[in-house]
From Swiss-Prot:
Origin superkingdom: Bacteria
Lineage: Bacteria, Bacillati, Bacillota, Bacilli, Lactobacillales
GO cellular component, as recorded: cytoplasm
Catalysed reactions, semicolon-separated: DNA(n) + a 2'-deoxyribonucleoside 5'-triphosphate = DNA(n+1) + diphosphate
Protein name per Swiss-Prot or TrEMBL: DNA polymerase III PolC-type
Chain's role: Required for replicative DNA synthesis. This DNA polymerase also exhibits 3' to 5' exonuclease activity.
Length: 1465
């Protein structure tokens, strides 16, 4: 073994016995290839022989695991001097190959991994079934197997396959059998879902009869014609076939038009056995219209041929005939007034657990004629706002609730404690073994105990009990107890009496005592024996409170930690003795560390205040009864998320009690404490608990079915008995019993979507805990939790008898709904915070600035505009919104940053005057800065005041200032001026955190919250879930079915977050719970801000929301100001040099060929993208107004492409006259002669893409008015194509910032490039950037080629953008220097004459913290060696190596010779 190899083995801690084996005797490392960018290391090993398979796996796992800890990926291969081709070794390595990519592909692994291999005639022979012995596997997969075996050390093998006829027949038989079973199950599921409906539903004449799946006659009937053809389940189709007929629902449609004018409709259908891709061709528009019925959600019958699509390589139906059919939907058939109310329903806001939107849930209930429905999501109320609005629209009562996680505040260590010296007490430490977790449905099979005094065992008890039936395999596997152990055991009652005698005058002790004591008490009660009344100590809670730093407090982990013997865990005698040994360790530590000497002290002095964090969660349903209850609900949700969050939101019982007014409580599901008590403790215990609640919930037996699989309940009869017991509990406790459905999806066929979502959580989720052990272990099936009709629920509870079933299903649920009052979840008005004298301040600031600019008295046009705006702003209570925005902008300005405006706030002249925006919305005008004389151009002949020619004031000769963008106020606050203002502001990214804190400072911490968001499962993520489900559960879906399942699983809540800049301000005369609960984003309890629990859009018309966004433009401007000393406000908007950038490159001193683009737009905000540069090349803008047009055209949808672009190309219109920004429509139409109200309405219809969606009568009225005022037809047609338009004020703010940046590019280029690379560039490659023009152009060409082949990565695309600017900079005569260990800054680029010095952060892989550490370390002294740079500077070996390669370190010595591995370990 070489020294280098031995060193590696030390690092990965390879076991000594393996290292000393003959296999490792001559081991060596031939080569190590280190890929620094991808952090991949390739090892090439040499061994004397192929390793034993166990040794190989150990080497593989340790090598991977060790390097993963250093964030390094590892691969390795082996060269073996001698190769052993024995069958056993080959077979082992053959199977190992399928654990490595790419041999682990699903199709290859499932088909080949279990086949037998032999080595004959210098070949590896695979005995395979005939159907896999084909060219596909030979050509696509066997070469990968050859490579993998070579990597194992077998050299290059020749592999051949031979067909095994016996295996072929066997597998074919199994396949046919399983396929038939699958088809049978699919059909049966379909029939069951419609069974009750078909029995009771009156015939619908126009409806197509439900298909009768008689598959044996299918072949005979196939030719009978489209109308009478047998319907084929999609799951049956596996090969190309002709004249197949499907019936199903369309879930995806895409229409395309070919170059020849033919149309193709690609669509996907499902019949819920599987899904299929289909195609239908139409020769022209007229034929295409015949197939309008092919629409998403439609139910169709289609006939066609099944063929392999040459592009997708999947089976596709080429449709020949298609017909719309009527689907028999489930209906609630009970008469009016006799329909149930669902009181336990989850929406897609139940995190990763339920599917329906609250709208679809409410719509279904309303469609069925239900008078109310409850919403009870898990631990949140995020569906409340949408539910509130939808219920009001649907005319149905929404009952607002949630399914809460209830915990005890302090979980006691001791039950029934008395005044007793712990040191002098006698303890009976006991444990029971049972056949399951339910004391009512499972049996005791062993009771064992150790009586202990002062740490010594003084007596023992150990008795088996025969339950009267054979033990299940699971019980035997878990406990180690077999039927043999139980032979000859004493009767249960005898053992119980003996154990009671054994326990006298002792403190009982058990680990998780609530279970053991509960089981014992249930059995005592059953045999008329007294329950336990003596003190009990629970060592589980004892450990949790005594050792809170431990993550696990189970008996196994504790015995290991304290070195207590536990030879046979889960046999009662061994567990009891181990628990006793632990008890005395705990007592000693409690006495020495906490002074605990008396039994009473355990609960008073040791139980921690936060013991609720470890308490067992029990579910309860909580319902809002009135408006007081709604606020209390919001408080409970907030407290559970903010103060009591631990893994999930928790509500301690005392907290619930303190906020219970206006709330009603239900006992929830099988995870509720009453249900649990019925199972584990008996009816009496359940009755005591039930008195806490307002009603008892029972659910359909199907909901409880998983408990049978988990052996908590024996069978269906057991489930029905539990339900009867719950009814008895309600009777004794005098609480109504209500049947609820625990709805998680609407239709039975949607069960698979929930299955996929839930299983994606992995086995760490409680719901996915497996039953049994070993490879066959599977999680319990999920219950059938669809939304049931009244008749379906009555059928579920028919075993109770007709009258009782009706009472719990219908009468009691209706009575409960009647107890619920209507509440206002979302307020109808805007509630702004109060700022003293806000109205007076806004008016005063407005006039003060207006007088300063335009003089006093004001010009009429200014005076009237201010009066109009202030009337609206002050009259509607919007002054505080304006003033708050002004205060924030002013504070940022005082810190040295400009603030850019977004959206339409620049449409408000008042906003301009008080400093919220730089955009002046008045008509283009001149104004004298000396005497305030002004001239306004109001005829629409000038698009922007910045485009007016320069001229002096005619009164005093001072050069005029120019301004005005001609934007009507109506585009901000609506025609009537009463729309809630949405003021969005772009702060510097550097100053954004300070601006956020300003909000808190102005309004107070308790009134300012980040705007909350809800993150749901995206379709791409859902697609991954489906593929994972396929892999983990042995499923194989065709592509269309994967798409269907992914669409069905998408949209479920996954997490929460916060808007990047949104701050919600609660009025200071109310509190946040009047509007929304609060929480931390993504459940991060360390976050510095709390967020609204509701998505901020749900309440944005009720409270003030400030959009304080971070943006690069203000940061860039600040950087340029710092570098140049130039105040950006003084930069003219009509600088000729800047405008020259839009027409050529001459102003930059380069040719288009040098920089690869005909204009100077590279790196200019708004105009630097390829798309906008192309627009500039086509339109040649020369004025500010035309730049505004370009900004609007580039940001709109269907405004440029297929619209304005064609009009300009065809010479019909110009850049100046096409529709660019939304506001231009209103201004243009008013200048044309239309009434302002109509002009405004047309603008609103067009900008929202509604022009073609309004009624023909309304649209024709507008068109007639436009034509009467000589609006050209092309303009009217252009309006009809638009889907979305950009506000002109937004465009003006962005263009103004862009021109300021461009000014520096023209006049102060080195400063511009310094700022650009410091702030805007996203990717760097310093070796290329400092390598000169040839290196930069070569790398750009390399990326260009990759782009053409769709091979460029996202990083390379970002790098290309950076290199375009580097190339331009170099062509202009500037230089890009190398990283300098002693001159480079940590983060910012530095200017040295005509050269830019890059910062450390520009080196790939070097983060901000390390960059700052290097700068700090160099200030303390020179780096004398690479090792010192690593240690003091914090740079990794990879970074140091990269610096050395780039020549940054010069001749810096290593300091000492280190192995390749020491740098990482």
């Amino acid at each position: 073994m070489s020294d280098l190899f031995a060193k590696l083995m030390d690092q990965i801690e390879m076991p000594l016995d393996m290292r000393r084996s003959s296999a490792f005797s001559s081991a060596d490392i031939i080569e190590v290839k280190v890929h620094s960018v991808s952090r991949l290391w390739e090892f090439h090993f040499a061994f004397a022989a192929v390793l034993p398979i166990a040794t190989y796996r150990e080497l593989h796992d340790r090598l991977i695991r060790t390097f993963e800890a250093a964030d390094i990926k590892v691969t390795f291969d082996i060269q073996a001097a001698q190769v052993d081709y024995s069958d056993d070794l080959l077979q082992a390595y053959y199977q190992e190959a399928f654990e490595h990519a790419p041999c682990n592909s699903a199709s290859f692994k499932s088909s080949f991994s279990k086949l037998k291999v032999t080595y004959e005639d210098d070949k590896l022979i695979i005995a395979a079934p005939g159907f896999v012995n084909n060219d596909h596997f030979r050509n696509n997969h066997l070469p990968n197997l050859v490579k993998q075996l070579e990597a194992f050390g077998f050299g290059i093998l020749t592999i051949d396959m031979v067909s095994d006829q016996e295996m072929t027949e066997h597998l074919t038989k199994n396949f046919v059998s399983s396929r038939q079973a699958l088809v049978k199950k699919a059909v049966q599921d379909n029939l069951e879902a419609q069974k009750s409906l078909e029995a009771m539903m009156p015939p619908v004449e126009e409806a197509t009869p439900a298909p009768k799946f008689d598959y044996k006659e299918r072949a005979a009937k196939r030719q009978a014609g489209f109308e009478k053809a047998t319907i084929t389940p999609m799951i049956e189709i596996e090969t190309e076939e002709n004249r197949i007929v499907f019936e199903g629902m369309v879930f995806d449609v895409e229409r395309k038009t070919t170059r020849t004018g033919r149309h193709i409709i690609n669509f996907k259908m499902t019949d819920y056995t599987s899904s299929f891709a289909l195609q239908k061709w139409a020769k022209d528009d007229e034929e295409l219209r015949k197939f309008d019925m092919i629409a998403k959600g439609a139910w169709l019958r289609v006939q066609g041929n099944i063929e392999t699509n040459p592009f997708t390589k999947s089976l596709t139906m080429n449709v020949q005939q298609v017909k719309e059919i009527v689907r028999h939907e489930r209906k609630d058939l009970m008469p009016e007034g006799q329909k149930r109310v669902e009181l336990h329903a989850h929406t897609n806001m139940s995190t990763m657990d339920a599917l329906p939107t609250v709208e679809s849930l409410i719509d279904t209930a309303a469609k069925w004629g239900h008078k109310a429905i409850a919403i009870t999501d898990h631990a949140n109320v995020q569906s409340f706002p949408h539910g509130y609005h939808r219920a009001r629209k649907a005319g149905i009562k929404a009952i607002f609730g949630l399914e809460a996680n209830i915990v005890e505040d302090k979980v006691p260590i001791s039950y029934e404690p008395v005044d007793m010296d712990l040191h002098e007490a006698t303890y009976v430490v006991f444990d029971v073994e049972t056949t399951g977790l339910s004391a009512m449905n499972n049996d005791l099979i062993q009771i064992a105990a150790s009586k202990m005094f002062k740490g010594n065992i003084v007596e023992q008890f150990d008795e088996f009990i025969d339950p009267g039936h054979p033990l299940s395999a699971f019980t035997t596997e878990l406990t180690g107890i077999t039927d043999k152990h139980l032979q000859g055991a004493k009767p249960l009652v005898t053992v119980l009496k003996a154990f009671q005698d054994f326990c006298k005058d002792s403190i009982l002790v058990a680990h998780n005592a609530s279970f053991d004591v509960g089981f014992m008490n249930a059995n005592y009660e059953r045999h008329d024996l007294p329950k336990i009344t003596q003190p009990v100590i629970d060592t589980l809670e004892f450990a949790r409170n005594l050792y809170p730093e431990y993550k696990r407090h189970g008996l196994g982990p504790l015995t290991k930690r304290f070195q207590v013997s536990l030879d046979h865990h889960h046999m009662a005698n061994y567990d009891a003795e181990a628990t006793g040994r632990l008890l005395f360790i705990f007592l000693k530590d409690a006495r020495e560390k906490h002074g605990i000497k008396n039994l009473l002290q355990l609960n008073t002095d040791l139980v921690a205040e936060d013991s609720y964090k470890k308490a067992r969660i029990k579910h309860a349903t909580i319902y809002v009864q009135n408006q007081v209850g709604l606020k209390n609900m919001f408080k409970l949700v907030s407290l559970s998320n903010i103060k009591y969050f631990e893994g999930v939101p928790r509500i301690p019982r005392t907290v619930l009690d303190a906020h219970r007014e206006g709330l009603l409580l239900g006992t929830a599901c099988s995870d509720g404490e009453v249900f649990d008590a019925v199972l584990t403790k008996g009816i009496d215990a359940a009755v005591d608990l039930a008195r806490y609640y307002d009603f008892i919930e029972i659910m359909p037996p199907a909901i409880y079915q998983p408990l049978v699989v988990r052996e908590l309940i024996k069978d269906q009869a057991g489930i029905e008995q539990v339900i009867r017991d719950l009814i008895e509990v309600g009777k004794r406790a005098k609480k109504p019993v209500l049947a609820t459905g625990n709805v998680h999806y609407l239709e039975p066929e949607e069960e698979i979507y929930r299955e996929i979502i839930v299983r994606s959580l992995g086995q760490g989720a409680m719901i996915n805990r497996t039953i049994g052990r070993g490879e066959g272990a599977q999680p319990a099936p999920l219950p059938k939790a669809h939304f049931r009709t009244t008749n379906e629920m009555l059928d579920e509870f028919a075993f109770l008898g007709k009258d009782l079933a009706y009472q719990v299903v219908v009468q009691n649920t209706q009575d409960f709904a009647d107890r619920i009052e209507e509440v206002e979840v979302v307020k109808g008005d805007l509630y702004t915070p109060y700022i003293d004298k806000a109205e007076e301040t806004v008016a005063e600031l407005t006039y003060q600035k207006a007088f300063e600019i335009y003089g006093n008295p004001l010009p009429d046009i200014i005076d009237l505009r201010i009066e109009k705006e202030l009337t609206s702003i002050l009259g509607n209570g919007f002054a505080v919104i304006y003033l708050a925005s002004q205060m924030l902008v002013n504070r940022s300005n005082e810190r040295g940053y400009l603030v850019g405006s977004r959206g339409s706030v620049g449409s408000s002249f008042v906003a301009t005057m008080i400093g919220i925006t730089e955009v002046n919305p008045m008509p283009p005008h001149y104004v004298c800065p000396s005497c305030q004389h002004s001239e306004f151009i109001t005829d629409g002949s000038v698009g922007s005041g910045y485009d007016l020619p320069n001229k002096p004031c005619p009164k005093c000769g001072t050069p005029y200032q120019k301004d005005g963008q001609d934007i009507p106020f109506e585009t901000f606050l609506g025609f009537d001026g009463d729309k809630v203002p949405d003021i969005d502001l772009n702060f510097s990214g550097d100053d954004q955190p300070s601006a956020h804190l300003d909000v808190r400072d102005i309004f107070g911490d308790e009134y300012a919250f980040r705007a909350g968001t809800v993150g749901t499962v995206a379709e791409k993520t859902a697609y991954g879930f489906v593929k994972g489900y396929e892999r983990d559960y042995g499923k194989f879906y065709r592509d269309a079915e994967v798409d269907r399942l992914a669409a069905g699983a998408a949209g479920v809540k996954r997490t929460t977050g916060q808007h990047p800049g949104g701050i919600v301000v609660i009025p200071n005369y109310m509190d946040v719970y009047d509007f929304t609960p609060v929480q931390y984003p993504a459940d991060d309890v360390t976050a510095s801000w709390q967020t609204t629990h509701f998505n901020f859009h749900d309440i944005d018309e009720n409270v003030l929301k400030l959009d304080i966004l971070g943006h690069d433009d203000p940061t860039m401007i600040r950087k340029l100001q710092d570098l140049s000393g130039i105040d950006p406000i003084t930069i003219p908007a009509d600088d000729p040099g800047v405008m020259a950038l839009f027409s050529g490159t001459e102003v930059l001193g380069v040719t288009p060929e040098q920089i690869g683009t005909p204009t100077g737009m590279l790196g200019i905000p708004e105009f630097g993208t390829n798309f906008v540069r192309g627009m500039v090349n086509e339109t040649h803008p020369t004025t500010f107004a035309e730049l505004l047009q370009l900004s609007g055209l580039s940001h709109g949808t269907d405004v440029w492409l297929g619209n304005a672009q064609d009009l300009i190309k065809e010479g019909i219109a110009t850049l100046k006259t096409v529709i660019g920004c939304r506001d231009d429509i209103m201004v243009y139409l008013m200048h044309a002669g239309l009434e302002p109200k109509m002009a405004f309405t047309i603008m609103e219809r067009v900008r929202k893409g509604l022009w073609l969606k309004i009624s023909e009568e309304e649209r024709n009225g507008y068109i007639d008015a436009m034509r009467e005022n000589n609006v050209p037809d092309w303009y009217i047609e252009s309006c009809g194509k638009i889907k979305y338009m950009f506000p002109k004020a937004h465009a003006a703010a962005y263009v103004l910032m862009a021109l300021r940046v461009a000014y520096f590019k023209v006049h102060h280029p080195i400063m511009y490039y310094c700022a650009y690379f410091s702030i805007r560039a996203k990717a760097f490659e310093l070796k290329t950037m400092s390598g000169g023009l040839d290196a930069v152009k070569a790398r750009m060409e390399d990326i260009t080629i990759k782009r053409k082949n769709n091979e460029a990565t996202n990083v390379e695309n970002d790098l290309f953008t950076t290199l375009e600017i580097v190339n331009e900079m170099l062509e202009r005569g500037f230089k890009f220097g190398k990283l300098d260990l002693y001159k480079s800054d940590a983060i910012e680029f530095q200017i040295k004459g005509d050269t830019l010095i890059p910062p450390f952060i520009a080196l790939e892989g070097l983060g901000e913290n390390v960059a700052k550490q290097i700068v700090k370390a160099r200030q303390e002294g020179e780096f004398l060696s690479k090792m010192e740079l690593r240690k003091r500077g914090g740079a990794s070996s990879t970074l140091v190596e990269k610096m050395d390669e780039m020549g940054i370190l010069g001749n810096m010595p290593e300091d000492n010779q280190l192995s390749l591995f020491d740098d990482f370990f």
